[in-house]
Design a protein with these regions (language model features):
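Regulatory and interdomain segments flanking nucleotide-handling catalytic cores
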Residues: 1-216, 220-236
Length: 236
């Protein structure tokens, strides 16, 4: 099992050289951000399509946020698919050379996303979870697209470096009141809540349905009554 990701720069043909340079920087950033969760090095194709292969429990939004909140952030189209992957006989093949059913699904999904002008598709293999993620994804894309350069910087410090408002103010050498205004304009708090919600929904897709049903049944079963306690007392 693995988490396959495909991403391409929206409108990359208008600046293919710039898009390629930016993707190269993003690949290095994501390799570092995911660390041991990578099952293969990130890479990108000549068509400016980024590909990655991560552990199934990895957080897809890490890639989305790193791309969207960078200083030269470009609009991306993302597809994430959790599913089966083939073994790597070499042990060091990059994601662009890996195969498996999850890659096939991801290829079809990103083509559909281009046709439907979708920007973020996350597929866990559980229809109920995937449907809810499809409802939430456009809201995240809209919020990220609406940020100015300054707001992206503030959001990046808060969401990727986990800094408090006071720490962001210190980092940027501005008054805390100024950062408070920036937080409000960037809608950092609502953005954090939305990201947390999507992460929660996504993580629910990793729970085995059979195991979840068993745990739910166990949790709702009444506790057995110990002999002598039926009337609220204990026999001596």
């Amino acid at each position: 099992m693995g988490l396959v990701l495909f991403g391409d720069v929206v409108g990359s043909r208008r600046d293919s050289v710039g898009s390629t340079a930016w993707l190269r920087e993003l690949v290095a950033e994501l390799d570092s951000a995911y660390g041991s969760e990578r099952l293969a090095p990130f890479g990108f194709t000549q068509g400016d399509e980024l590909q990655g292969l991560l552990a199934p429990e990895a957080d897809p939004l890490t890639a989305v946020l790193h791309a969207a909140l960078g200083s030269a952030g470009r609009r991306m189209r993302w597809v994430f698919v959790r599913g089966e992957i083939d073994e790597d006989s070499t042990g060091n093949a990059p994601a662009t050379e890996r195969t498996g059913s999850a890659f096939v699904v991801a290829r079809d999904a990103i083509e559909d996303a281009r046709t439907g002008r979708e920007r973020l598709v996350i597929l866990t293999g559980r229809p109920g979870v995937d449907s809810l993620l499809a409802d939430l994804a456009p809201a995240l894309v809209d919020m990220l697209d609406g940020l100015t350069d300054r707001q992206r910087l503030v959001a990046r410090l808060a969401m990727l470096e986990d800094l408090r408002q006071s720490e962001v103010a210190d980092r940027l050498h501005v008054r805390r009141a100024t950062i408070s205004v920036s937080f409000n304009r960037a809608r950092v708090r609502p953005l954090q809540r939305l990201v947390a919600g999507i992460r929660l929904v996504y993580s629910s897709g990793s729970v085995d349905p059979g195991r979840a049903a068993t745990e739910a049944t166990t949790a709702t079963e009444p506790e057995p009554i110990v002999a002598g306690q039926a009337d609220g007392g204990v026999q001596q």
